[in-house]
Structure formats: C-alpha cells, structure tokens
From Swiss-Prot:
It comes from the Eukaryota. Residues 1-20 are annotated as: Disordered. It comes from Penaeus vannamei. This is Histone H4. Core component of nucleosome. Nucleosomes wrap and compact DNA into chromatin, limiting DNA accessibility to the cellular machineries which require DNA as a template. Histones thereby play a central role in transcription regulation, DNA repair, DNA replication and chromosomal stability. DNA accessibility is regulated via a complex set of post-translational modifications of histones, also called histone code, and nucleosome remodeling. A mixture of histones H2B and H4 has antimicrobial activity against the Gram-positive bacterium M.luteus. Residues 1-14 have a biased composition (Gly residues). The modification N-acetylthreonine is found at residue 2. The modification N6,N6-dimethyllysine is found at residue 21.
Amino acid sequence: MTGRGKGGKGLGKGGAKRHRKVLRDNIQGITKPAIRRLARRGGVKRISGLIYEETRGVLKVFLENVIRDAVTYTEHAKRKTVTAMDVVYALKRXXXTLYGFGG
C-alpha cells in the first residue's frame, strides 16, 4: 500500500493547479527578428517599423481563432488533450490546409 488512501491518483496524475499563472504580454515573445525572418522567407526586402506591432496583433487574432476551433473539436470528442489532428482540422476549417501531421 502506498498510503494514498481510496481513489488516490498514480504518479504523474496530479490534480488541477489551484493557482494558475496569468499569461499576459506573451505576444511580445514574438520578437522583432522573428517577424523579420518570417518576412524574409516571404520575400520581403525592407520592413517598416510599424509592421512589428501590426503583425503581432494579426498573429494573435489568427491563433485565437485556430485554438478556439481546435478546443471545440477536442471537447466534442470528449477529450481533455488537444491533438495535432484537432489543430489540422481547425486550420483546414479556416482554409489554410497543413500537410505532414496525419489525416
């Protein structure tokens, strides 16, 4: 007996965290050089200084929509873990098909 009593959770099965760290200002993690690299990959030569904040805003809205759809697929399947296929289907729904992740 491990001394956990009835209904004790096994290893790695901890309950929900009581205090969750509030995530804010993480969009600044998309750095100026990262946006510049993406633009270079797209064939851009010179970039205006105002582009960086605008790109962060557009990316945030896009990811919010994709994540919302992926979580909807997960909840419909009565799962708690978002799979790669949920994200693929969410992207496909927003007409941006992604290859190489199954399906």
